Amino acid sequence: MSDLRITLDPDFIAQTKKEVTPHWGELGWVTYKRTYARWLDDKNRSENWDETVKRVIEGNINLDPRLKNNPSKKTIHELTAEAKQLFRLVYGLAATPSGRNLWISGTDYQKRNGDSLNNCWFISIRPQKYGNSHIVPAYLTQDQVAPSMPFSFLFDQLMKGGGVGFSVVDENINQIPKLDQKVDLTIVIDKQSKSYDASLKLGATDLDEWKKTNQEKEDYIYYKLPDTREGWVLANARLIDMHFNSTNPENKKKLVLDISDIRPYGAKIHGFGGTASGPMPLIEMLFDINQILNERAGQKLTAVDATDICNLIGKTVVAGNVRRSAELALGSSNNQDFITMKQDKKKLYHHRWASNNSVAINSEFDNYQPIADSILHNGEPGVVNLELSRNYGRIKDGYQAGIDGEVEGTNPCGEISLANGEPCNLFEVFPFIAQKQGWDLKEAFKLAARYTKRVTFSPYDWEVSRKIINKNRRIGVSMSGIQDWILSTFGHRVVTGFKTATDSETGKEIKDPVYDPEIIKTVDGLYQAVVDADKDYSQELNCNTSIKHTTVKPSGTVAKLAGVSEGMHFHYSGYLIQRIRFQETDPLLPALKDCGYRTEPDIYTPHTICVEFPIKAANADSDNFASAGTVSIAEQFATQAFLQTYWSDNAVSCTITFQNDESDQIAPLLHQYRYAIKSTSLLPYYGGSLKQAPKEPISKEKYEKADNHITGNVEIVFEQTNEDQKGLELVDQSDCDNGACPIK
């Protein structure tokens, strides 16, 4: 029997559209239309919101493994009812799956690529076996350990649109053997290739010229790259592995890579979307990586070398147009070369921008001042406490030795602690909106837990991932718009004050936060609802319960859809101008102008138009409202600790902002919360002083004046013109303050 497929009835969708109004933020519909609405060739337009939600929910509900094995009528009925509930929840924007799911779920690409629904991944940079994976170099057996494997994993996941955290701590880097030899790399290309001239300028060699003097020789390895993602990965793997005797069985020192078949710049990429970069970025990457490896011949790679290789891979992937490479490098806290590697401005601008860098610590670590000094200068490194992640769920639940003992790092935004090869798996509920729309919050979080659980049954491409996902079934149910919800529901922020206390280990005076007990009780109840939902569904599916369940994701672009505060973060300002950049040919622009939005040419990027959106935060007029520009660094630390203690058993993504006069508090606060925060990062608060800044705080009066100029609904005006175009995106989006997340 073929798999049964659940679909949502058009009559149900039509009725829901009458009953439920999506909670679009001021930027919501425009952001959706240019980020997550897929092009429909048969209708010559991009999706509408109900079509996107239908695709996403159907793509998810049909992952339930029971549908593959003659499901009962009861199961079909229950899953159909659940799909309807999910549709209502997401259509109303009371909750959303991750941006990755909004873009990919329910597509043919999802069916072809088992990894496609997971936003981000983690891999340890040490020799590993490829195993029974979709990519295995022909010169290796599946069980052969190879230095190239983690780099191949990273390259593959980045090209599939995922972000990757990677670990270059001493314990991993020390496992890489010394490089045995240099490799003479030649990249050849046929004259018939449209990329011929551009490739020669970057150091490639004419194929016919090379054949004249080399074809009869036998001292080289030749590999012709197919025009596939896997071909790029395998070329890089061969280059890396040839430097090591254990993975160079022919013991040859010359590598010839033929790029003639790679599609040219501008050609369409089927599947994920976008247009091709041509082979030029790959040529640069391969030569750059080979230079790093050759310079280490006879020695061992350093953490900086490995990070450089990963950054060069990330830089190459960025050139693929629709993708934005997201990396987090995790190094040892005593490695000063790693901590200071971005101070080399030449290499920073060339490729080291491609990762956010953090250091791995434990709770005994106390040398925070050098970290604080570095943060003050360039906003890095972030801090990841692996000891807490391995031995704690929620801090409230106490020490549980090895409860997550295989954790080695995090995803790029730091909200999910991950084992080697493991992905994050995210869904977020906006309690502020869910309550307004009449949802029982526990029911909303239950639906979120079941959605993420189904994602773990995807047919994953890499053996290392399949094994750890099958074991851990990790999910990440997030709440977002937290500041809006707490202030609207409880009338004040979660931190009601501070009391003087003494650090039991150092004897120093500290200020302990005081939390509202009603908020503690509410959040704890929602956590239990997620755990109970996972337990019940795991029994239905006969699989392991999830090792961890909850998180707080940064929620940049997705929060814009619903118009709520991002994750746990405070609004940037009570009132602000948010500037969004559009390609100058975007047919949305006339609709925006007709509705009264201010537009002007972008001063930084040619052929780009900057549009100003006046934004008012929820509760902006409340006496208890605080923004990122007014809330203290101490309250932000305390708020993150609250969520780690009572809500998140994974971690909490937070970029704490600080004013110049608060910089001396960074090291003491990192030390104070060493037993309560699993990962964090900090950035100075800039306040939008740049011309055409993405966010510019403004007064209430200026907001009201700008808002009064807006006279129409962009969605309605745009649909009346019916002039949509394929392949348009917003220019230079950022999904969170530190730019760590892929947008979709």
Curated annotation (Swiss-Prot):
Pfam families from the UniProt entry: RNR-II_ins_dom, RNR_Alpha
Adenosylcobalamin-binding-1 as annotated region, ranges: 570-631
Disulphides: C120-C424
Gene3D superfamilies in alphabetical order: 3.20.70.20, b-12 dependent (class ii) ribonucleotide reductase, Chain A, Domain 2, b-12 dependent (class ii) ribonucleotide reductase, chain A, domain 3
Entries under SUPFAM superfamilies matching the protein: PFL-like glycyl radical enzymes (SSF51998)
Keywords assigned by UniProt, alphabetized: Allosteric enzyme, Cobalamin, Cobalt, Disulfide bond, DNA replication, Oxidoreductase, Redox-active center
Region Effector region-2: start-end pairs: 169-318
Database matches in InterPro entries: RdRp_reductase_class-2, RNR-II_ins_dom, RNR_alpha_hel, RTP_Rdtase_AdoCbl-dep
Full protein name: Adenosylcobalamin-dependent ribonucleoside-triphosphate reductase
